[in-house]
């Protein structure tokens, strides 16, 4: 959580103090990208309070930076991008090099039954 706020501050946001409470049904360490989801939720909450970028890809990069540089996990960007841009009932098409992302609805995916 602190790493996500630090990452936003590194982006130039005038971050101040905050009290933050997180709740989740996702078990920690379950392999369901819970750390990426927490980082993204924290970046969004801090951004809403203190300002910062609005581009979802930029916000995902800030969350990834927290995981890489503060937590010490050399993760890629996929989990953070999924947390930032996915919507229920859709599949995410993501180019992790360019961060180009597109969503397709279940109805548009003939293979998704």
Residue ranges with predicted function:
Residues 51-113:
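ATP-dependent small-molecule kinase catalytic core of the GHMP/sugar-kinase superfamily
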Residues 1-62:
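Anion-binding (especially nucleotide phosphate/pyrophosphate-binding) glycine-rich loop
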């Amino acid at each position: 959580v602190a790493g996500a706020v630090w990452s936003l501050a590194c982006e130039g946001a005038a971050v101040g103090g905050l009290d933050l409470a997180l709740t989740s049904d996702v078990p920690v360490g379950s392999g369901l990208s819970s750390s990426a989801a927490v980082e993204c939720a924290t970046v969004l909450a801090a951004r809403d309070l203190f300002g910062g970028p609005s581009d979802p890809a930029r916000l995902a990069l800030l969350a990834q930076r927290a995981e890489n540089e503060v937590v010490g996990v050399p993760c890629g960007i996929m989990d953070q991008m999924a947390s930032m841009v996915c919507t229920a009932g859709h599949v995410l098409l993501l180019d992790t090099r360019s961060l180009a992302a597109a969503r397709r609805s279940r109805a548009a995916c003939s293979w998704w039954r």
